[in-house]
């Protein structure tokens, strides 16, 4: 069954080019040209991945991303004409998985689509082998088989990538991991982003799992090196 892709771009010629090339690759493609229609289309079609322009009439891409993330966890690739660090970081903080700056190569974008689909929907063998092992860290319990986490009995809503990052750190408790290592291991060697992606995801995780994100007791920073998950008796 073909993977579904939703393309959201107010520039119809760009959307048409992406639709044509994605269909050539065997994907089922749906297009929207403004933010309001994009949300409706994503809710109706429940695609496997979304290509989302930031500058849109109606709701902008950031608002669409925020709204979609309330319900879905499919990969979202942000398309932007702004080569701005602020836009990239904000998009990642809202739950985007990747970003591409216009003008972009259609071949590169399709490669990113394939890479994001592969990372999101394929579990490494080692994850399957130990999936039944619950991990307890103080007040937090990780359920790898259900891709879920509870804190003091309450569910913590994590994105797919947030869960993978926290689960990976939990399996290497107390071991400092560099940003580069986490990017390669959790996001994959074919990920096109930079290490700032790790920082943004860590920040989102802390906001969800820490009682006081400014003074974390679970995910700790080793300044100048990376991050580790604090051991608790």
UniProtKB/Swiss-Prot annotation:
GO terms for molecular function: phosphorelay response regulator activity; transcription cis-regulatory region binding. Its main location: cytoplasm. GO terms for cellular component: cytosol; protein-DNA complex. Residues 132-231 bind DNA. The keyword Transferase does not apply. Pfam families: Response_reg, Trans_reg_C. Gene3D superfamilies: 3.40.50.2300, 6.10.250.690, Winged helix-like DNA-binding domain superfamily/Winged helix DNA-binding domain. CDD domains: REC_OmpR_YycF-like, trans_reg_C. The modification 4-aspartylphosphate is found at residue 53. The keyword Cytoplasm applies. Residues 4-117 form the Response regulatory domain. Phosphorylated by WalK. It is found in: Cytoplasm. GO terms for biological process: regulation of DNA-templated transcription. Member of the two-component regulatory system WalK/WalR. This is Transcriptional regulatory protein WalR. The gene is walR.
């Amino acid at each position: 069954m073909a993977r579904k892709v939703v393309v959201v771009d107010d520039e119809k010629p760009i959307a048409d080019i992406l639709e044509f090339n994605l269909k050539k690759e065997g994907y089922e493609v749906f297009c929207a040209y403004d933010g309001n229609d994009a949300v409706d289309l994503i809710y109706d079609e429940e695609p496997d991945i979304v290509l989302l322009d930031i500058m849109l009439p109606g709701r902008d891409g950031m608002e669409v991303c925020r709204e979609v993330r309330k319900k879905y966890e499919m990969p979202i690739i942000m398309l932007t004409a702004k080569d701005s660090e602020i836009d990239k970081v904000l998009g990642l903080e809202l739950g985007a998985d990747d970003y591409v700056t216009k003008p972009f190569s259609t071949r590169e974008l399709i490669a990113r689509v394939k890479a994001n689909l592969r990372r999101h929907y394929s579990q490494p063998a080692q994850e399957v082998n130990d999936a039944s092992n619950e991990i307890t860290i103080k007040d937090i319990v990780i359920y790898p088989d259900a891709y879920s986490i509870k804190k003091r009995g309450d569910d913590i809503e994590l994105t797919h990538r947030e869960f993978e990052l926290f689960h990976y750190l939990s399996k290497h408790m107390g071991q400092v991991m560099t940003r580069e290592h986490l990017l390669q291991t959790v996001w994959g060697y074919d990920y096109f982003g930079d290490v700032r992606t790790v920082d943004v995801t860590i920040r989102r995780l802390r906001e969800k799992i820490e009682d006081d994100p400014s003074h974390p007791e679970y995910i700790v920073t080793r300044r100048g090196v990376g991050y580790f998950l604090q051991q608790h008796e």
